[in-house]
Amino acid sequence: MYGSYRKPRELIWVGGWVTYVLLCAEGFTGYVLPWGQMSFWAAQVIISLLGSIPIIGEDLATWIRGDYLISGITLSRLFAFHVVLLPIMIIAVVFFHILALHEIGSNNPDGIDIKKHVDKDGVPLDSKPFYPYDITHDIYALGVFLLIFCSVVFFFPEGGGYVLEYVNFEPANPLSTPAHIVPSWYFTPFYAMLRAVDFSLFGFTAKFLGFVTMAAGIAIFAALPWLDRSPVTVS
């Protein structure tokens, strides 16, 4: 890994981090919409985490749910978030991310600023045209992605229970808790952080400390440009 987040590209890095967080939120809200057994209980677990926040937690969780329990009101809200609010926010953040990238320029593993050596037209001497080199490179990568994506969607949608959990084919039942409430595979690292904290400390409950640990595991990536104090840009 090289210092793609180092000065002067902090804004680009943070913009990418915000995009990642919004995509996680988009994935979570979309996961709840089928209203299957695992979807229901995943929403119950995640939203109830907010209830562990001292003083305001329970009121905040009730406000987000729109009810005292996960219900159709919650589903309608998450549907609006998934279809309207979050996509608009993602498009806006990606737009500003591209603007920042256009202004500052991309990085490279050697940490060399190619803008220091330009020709009479202002084009870096050590650069290559975006077309056809990068265009053909990206088209190839896009083709490989679409091949895998379409193979899963049309021929292997369950993904052996990893893409679509079999238990989620059952309708949501608030009176029957699944034997194991597991997150989608892309949330597994953060869910592991949440479950790893099983002790109370300084008057804070284990549930709250686990929530803080999970949130910190996500937020720490945004602070990388300021945490990395090494004088060497690349590794």
Model-inferred region functions:
Residues 1-235:
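Membrane-embedded and interfacial regions of multi-pass energy-transducing membrane proteins
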